[in-house]
């Protein structure tokens, strides 16, 4: 009986300490509104009139949407008719400020199954996202949605 009581007391103590062991979510987790999209041109990043949002969940998912207001925008590896939409799982490494998304569905179906590694920097309610490979030549700035 004493062994059961000690075991129950230990389990109760461990259960009450569980929140102390819980990890804080990454600063990347949340809903973000695109404020600037820049593409490399002649060696410099230049703004392109895009709008969009990025949603990263604690459950380990990412969804992204972005739109060029030009209905005649040329397709890119990520867009069709000026629109980008994708969803997938995400693994975040806060110590290196990087993440990898494995695309599970996308408007541009060639993206499905691809792993995309990205760098991010969060400062307050602002986040800058860029490719790991600078030759991809783009950068996106987001602002966290507020209640």
Q: What is the role of each PLM region?
A:
Residues 8-17:
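Bacterial N-terminal signal peptides
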Residues 7-8, 27:
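Short helix-onset patch at the extreme N-terminus, typifying the N->h transition
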Residues 1-7:
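Positively charged n-region of N-terminal signal peptides that target proteins for export
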Residues 21-147:
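Lipid interaction determinants
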């Amino acid at each position: 009986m004493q062994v059961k009581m000690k075991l129950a007391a230990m389990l109760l103590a461990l259960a009450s300490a569980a929140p102390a062991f819980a990890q804080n979510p990454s600063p990347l987790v949340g809903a973000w509104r695109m404020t600037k999209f820049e593409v490399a041109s002649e060696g410099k990043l230049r703004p392109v009139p895009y709008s969009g949002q990025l949603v990263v969940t604690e459950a380990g998912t990412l969804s992204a949407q972005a739109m060029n207001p030009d209905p005649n925008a040329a397709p890119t590896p990520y867009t069709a008719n000026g629109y980008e939409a994708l969803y997938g799982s995400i693994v975040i490494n806060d110590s290196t400020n990087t993440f990898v998304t494995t695309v599970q569905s996308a408007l541009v179906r060639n993206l499905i199954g691809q792993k995309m590694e990205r760098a991010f920097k969060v400062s307050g309610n602002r986040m800058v996202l860029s490719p790991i490979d600078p030759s991809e030549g783009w950068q996106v700035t987001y602002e966290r949605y507020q209640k």
